[in-house]
Regions:
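Membrane-embedded alpha-helical segments of integral membrane proteins
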Residues: 18-63, 360-363, 457-509
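Membrane-interface helix/helix-cap signal primarily in integral membrane proteins
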Residues: 2-17, 80-256, 601-634
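Hydrophobic alpha-helical segments of membrane proteins
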Residues: 224, 229, 317, 402-418, ...
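Hydrophobic alpha-helical segments of integral membrane proteins
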Residues: 7-18, 205-220, 229, 237, ...
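Non-globular, low-confidence helical/coil segments that flank catalytic cores
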Residues: 108, 131, 146-160, 180, ...
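Hydrophobic alpha-helical transmembrane segments in multi-pass membrane proteins
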Residues: 25, 41, 63-76, 190, ...
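N-terminal leader/targeting segments
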Residues: 1-98, 102, 508-509, 629-630
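Divalent metal-coordination and catalytic microenvironments
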Residues: 33, 109, 161, 233, ...
Length: 634
């Protein structure tokens, strides 16, 4: 009994350490409520909402009876608020449209968004009087291979397209894209075959400047491959980077340099902030009477806002802009600036405005990376390290970059595996030269060139930046082509990701070593569950058009997967580089009727796996073992 009392006392003291983090845990509980609503069915939502309300009512009653349940009430209210905000988003989102195959259609549409890539242009459109009535209930995301410069956001276009509704994943059990697409209003995808501009609205000054900037950089550098990197860093448009080069940048673990995120924004803001501080210091009448930092913050925020508009307001840059603004606001008000407070307030404000953003990979990875950096910086492990004995600046620099890469990798690797089914470990090495070249050479020089855009000095600065950008391309080309530079990972289940991230959040945020150890155990359990997940033996889509089976550690396709995109997605989800065509020697046999697969049978050891149609013409997986059939519907 004495030992138990001591343990209870230790736990009580440890939990008291979390009182200073109560606001952070409350915000995370709000986010948990959003996720609980998005990833449960209609019946489960009613059960969760009712149970939460009952527990909240009981907690209030106990609190009235002088029982200390204040913290429990706060958490329940936060969870319920997050749950209800997500429920409202679901309620106001159109229901899933009727499923149909690819259809040819001609109709007018209004351009809502344009995203340029190294291949096709991705257009987000809203249909105007379409022949398929359900298309009026949401947005269309279509690929266009023509010239995107002839129209802009707000233009009305007439398109001829092959279109299909967004389906529940192109891979068995993978519903992540449809969950993301539905709450962002995307109900159909397809390809534009013909496009005619009906009404071209006048482009804004920002759009015109962005297009002129891109063409000027491209021509000033003689269309060098480094020009694409410069354009991506300044405008967020990676369409000027060749596809092979873009793949190498991703496989080398350096794709983050192309995303306008907090690192880019902080370099630009710090650059402008320091310049204006030195300018104001030249005037003693100002420097001696006023706080020049407050004056310098005004142009820094203005430049940050301009950079955000030129970059077309990506999520990661928007998050960084809010954090920068809040930091300078604290400077104006003479308040202490705590980075964790700023991060969580930004996190909460973005979720309150758009709870569906929590489903965005960019949102998840951006916040988790910054969260990891701040937590590591605030930890005793970092603060207690004595760096002074290390006299070599090179060693300290390499160690700092390597430590930053490890922290960023640990924070985001599981999101990378979940969304992209791969992990570029080589990034731990390639980032050592790439990050300083990008942030302290290419970005500042390019930014000054942008300020002098249209002049000979601007063109000269673009050429200088292009020289170093080409060095970055050479580094990424070399590291990406090393043996096993990036590793493919099989599909991770949503619940496995949730367990791992919950454990990491506890490790990063908690002050109590008890909660830290508990979070570490939870994260390890989730990781072990993922590693030990059995490989699927038989995989198929809803109409049995594509059937893939496992034999000898390799996957074989019954019929060739005609779509390169579909082949890539299936291979990624299965964690392999390719799916091989089935040869005549394989043991999988398929029954056919009028050249259509109606069932397949695969023998492995004493078991027989088979796929066939049910009475309702829907595919059913049947597993046979010891003479007993067990149906498992897809």
């Amino acid at each position: 009994m004495v030992a138990l009392k001591k343990v209870a006392e230790i736990l009580k003291n440890q939990l008291k350490c979390e009182e200073t983090n109560l606001r952070f845990w409350t915000i995370l509980t709000f986010a948990a409520g959003i996720l609980a609503c998005f990833f449960t069915g209609q019946t489960a939502r009613m059960i969760v909402a009712t149970s939460t309300c009952i527990v909240l009512l009981l907690a209030v009653i106990f609190h009235i009876l002088n029982r200390n349940t204040k913290i429990l009430i706060v958490f329940l209210v936060a969870f319920l608020c997050g749950f209800l905000s997500a429920a409202w988003k679901i309620y106001t989102t159109p229901d899933e449209p009727t499923k149909y195959g690819a259809r040819e259609a001609i109709f007018d549409a209004k351009v809502r968004d344009i995203r340029l890539t190294s291949g096709d242009t991705i257009l987000t459109l809203s249909a105007i009087n379409p022949p398929i009535l359900s298309l009026k209930n949401g947005l269309l995301k279509l690929k266009y291979s023509g010239n995107p410069m002839e129209f802009s956001v707000g233009s009305t276009v007439k398109i001829k397209t092959s279109i299909r509704t967004v389906s529940y994943g192109v891979f068995l059990g993978d519903k992540s894209y449809e969950n993301y697409a539905r709450f962002f209003g995307i109900i159909a995808r397809g390809n534009i075959k013909e496009l005619e501009v009906v009404d071209s609205t006048s482009q804004s000054f920002t759009d015109n400047f962005r297009k002129h900037l891109q063409s000027r950089i491209y021509e000033a550098t003689n269309r060098s491959r480094g020009a694409g990197v410069i354009i991506a860093i300044l405008t967020g448009n990676n369409s000027f980077i060749p596809q092979e080069q873009l793949d190498n940048i991703r496989h080398s673990g350096c794709a983050h340099i192309l995303a306008i995120s907090g690192l880019h924004m902080s370099v630009i803001v710090s650059f402008v902030f320091m310049i204006f501080i030195h300018i104001f210091s030249l005037f003693p009448s100002i420097a001696l009477r006023y706080n020049t930092k407050k004056f310098a913050a005004i142009p820094a925020i203005a430049v940050c806002l301009i950079y955000l508009q030129i970059a077309n307001v990506p999520i990661s840059a928007f998050r960084s802009f809010i954090m920068v603004t809040l930091g300078f606001l604290a400077l104006f008000l003479n308040r202490a600036r705590t980075t964790m407070n700023v991060l969580f307030f930004t996190f909460l404000s973005m979720l309150v405005l758009s709870p569906e953003r929590i489903l965005s990979p960019s949102f998840q990875m951006s916040f988790m990376a910054v969260f990891g950096f701040i937590s590591a910086y605030n930890s005793r492990l970092v603060n207690n390290v004595n760096w002074h004995p290390i006299k070599s600046r090179t060693v300290r620099y390499v160690g700092g970059i390597l430590a930053s890469s490890i922290i960023a990798t640990l924070s985001t690797v599981f999101f990378e595996i979940y969304h992209f089914k791969q992990y570029a470990w080589i990034g731990l090495i390639s980032n050592i030269p790439v990050i300083p070249l990008t942030e302290f050479v290419v970005l500042p020089i390019s930014f000054v060139g942008m300020l002098c855009n249209g002049t000979a000095l601007g063109d000269l600065l673009y050429c200088v930046a292009d020289f170093f950008a080409c060095i970055i391309c050479q580094i990424t080309d070399y590291t990406a082509n090393l043996h096993n530079a990036y590793l493919l990972a099989p599909q991770m289940q949503t619940w496995q990701l949730g367990i791992i991230i919950a454990g990491l959040v506890a490790v990063f945020l908690a002050r109590s070593w008890v909660i830290k150890i508990g979070g570490m155990i939870i994260a390890v359990c989730g990781l072990i569950s993922y590693i030990n997940s059995p490989k699927p033996v038989l995989v198929y889509n809803q109409n049995l058009k594509n059937v893939v089976f496992l034999e000898g550690g390799k996957y074989y396709s019954v019929e060739p997967i005609k779509s390169d995109y579909l082949h890539k997605i299936w291979a990624q989800n299965l964690g392999v580089r390719e799916i091989l065509p089935m040869s005549d020697s394989k043991v999988l046999s398929c029954q056919r009727a009028r050249d259509r697969i109606i069932g397949c049978e695969y023998k492995i050891a004493d078991n027989v796996y088979s796929i066939k149609y049910s009475n309702k013409k829907k595919p059913v997986a049947v597993y046979f073992n010891g003479g007993r059939f067990v149906e498992r519907k897809d």
